[in-house]
């Protein structure tokens, strides 16, 4: 099974507001950068969207080390939040509907093809790949504002 390292990040200009995401995929000496934007979204949705997009681009099942500076994204897997939400019919412990449920369900489906290790990195620090993802996300927002990226 191929081993792939992925870095992801999401950003929002206003929350909610125009948002972007970036991802860097590394396999051996190969590297791929992805990004996208939405006209009205939240930073949390962009964090999840980055992971979905990165995992979706993998053509076969892989062993993935996915790094994100989003505690929300990483802890949903590492702390068992997603499993608990599913068991509880997508309700929080306070019996409220889970936010971003559409994206969480999509991420679970896409991630199920792979062996994913969810890893937290410190945001806006000295990690060049995480910093690059942030640059990609912010550039996607800027491009959206210039109408260079069609919104989905």
Swiss-Prot record:
Disulfide linkage: none
Cofactor note: Binds 1 Mg(2+) ion per subunit. May bind a second metal ion at a regulatory site, or after substrate binding.
Uppermost EC category: hydrolase
Origin: domain of life: Bacteria
Cofactor: Mg(2+)
InterPro entries on file: RNase_H, RNaseH-like_sf, RNaseH_domain, RNaseH_sf, RNaseHI
Reaction catalysed by this enzyme: Endonucleolytic cleavage to 5'-phosphomonoester
Pfam families assigned: RNase_H
Residues of the RNase H type-1 domain: 1-142
GO MF annotation terms: magnesium ion binding; nucleic acid binding; RNA-DNA hybrid ribonuclease activity
Record-listed E.C. numbers: 3.1.26.4
GO biological process: DNA replication, removal of RNA primer
Chain residues that bind Mg(2+) 2: 9, 134
GO CC annotations on file: cytoplasm
Residues engaged in binding Mg(2+) 1: 9, 47, 69
Compartment list: Cytoplasm
Alphabetic keyword roster: Cytoplasm, Endonuclease, Hydrolase, Magnesium, Metal-binding, Nuclease
Main function: Endonuclease that specifically degrades the RNA of RNA-DNA hybrids.
Family, per entry: Belongs to the RNase H family.
Assembly with partners or alone: Monomer.
NCBIfam families membership: PRK00203.1
PANTHER family per record: RIBONUCLEASE H1 (PTHR10642:SF26)
UniProt cross-references to HAMAP family, sorted A to Z: RNase_H
UniProt-recorded name of the protein: Ribonuclease H
Species: Moorella thermoacetica (strain ATCC 39073 / JCM 9320)
Organism lineage: Bacteria, Bacillati, Bacillota, Clostridia, Moorellales
């Amino acid at each position: 099974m191929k081993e792939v390292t992925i870095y992801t990040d999401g950003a929002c200009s206003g929350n909610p507001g125009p948002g972007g995401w970036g991802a860097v995929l590394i396999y051996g000496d190969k590297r791929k950068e992805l990004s996208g934007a939405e006209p009205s979204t939240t930073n949390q949705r962009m964090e999840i969207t980055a992971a979905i997009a990165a995992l979706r681009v993998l053509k076969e099942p892989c062993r993935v080390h996915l790094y994100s500076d989003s505690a929300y994204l990483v802890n949903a897997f590492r702390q068992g939040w997603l499993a608990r939400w599913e068991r509880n019919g997508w309700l929080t412990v306070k019996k409220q509907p889970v936010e971003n449920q559409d994206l969480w369900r999509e991420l679970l489906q896409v991630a199920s093809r792979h062996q994913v290790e969810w890893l937290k990195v410190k945001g806006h620090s000295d990690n060049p790949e995480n910093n690059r993802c942030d640059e990609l996300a912010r550039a996607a927002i800027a491009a959206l504002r210039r109408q260079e990226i069609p919104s989905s």
